[in-house]
UniProtKB/Swiss-Prot annotation:
Pfam families: Ribosomal_S6. The gene is rpsF. This is Small ribosomal subunit protein bS6. HAMAP family: Ribosomal_bS6. GO terms for cellular component: cytoplasm; ribonucleoprotein complex; ribosome. Gene3D superfamilies: 3.30.70.60. It comes from the Bacteria.
Length: 137
């Protein structure tokens, strides 16, 4: 049965030919399905070190594939030492899921702005006399 997935994988920063490895991994996903969207996010910093590395090449693929193709992708990704991490989401199971890397980036900026506003938020200081006047009204 073909389902919709969002697959993200991180490649080692020391990989010489990332395009070749990306095309190999994408071919595995497309073997029993089709790739709807493929986004290369480039070399990004990790939040914490993974295998003594501080950076990696991020790649996101939105694909319609069978579970067999996904399992085969995960198996090969575990074997290949150049693949640092993988994440596979079955987007059909997530309610109100919007599949777009561009949207994800804008959502993160909105989230960061909200957090900044919360961090800088202070209750306004109201003198007791003013508070008593407001309560009596």
């Amino acid at each position: 049965m073909i389902k919709k997935y969002e697959v993200m994988y991180i490649l080692d920063q020391d990989v010489k030919d990332t395009k070749e490895l990306v095309s190999k991994l994408d071919a595995i996903l497309a073997e029993n399905g089709k790739i709807l969207e493929s986004n290369d996010l480039g070399l990004l910093d990790f939040t914490y070190e993974i295998n003594h590395k501080k950076k990696g090449f991020y790649h996101v693929v939105i694909v319609e594939a069978t579970t067999q193709a996904i399992k085969e992708f995960e198996r090969i990704a575990k074997i290949d030492k150049n693949v640092v991490r993988t994440l596979v989401l079955n987007t059909e199971n997530i309610q109100n899921y919007e599949q777009s890397v561009v949207l994800s980036k804008t959502d993160m900026t909105k989230y960061e702005e909200e957090q900044r506003e919360k961090k800088n938020f202070r209750k306004p200081f109201i003198k007791r006399e003013e508070a008593a006047v407001k309560e009596s009204k």
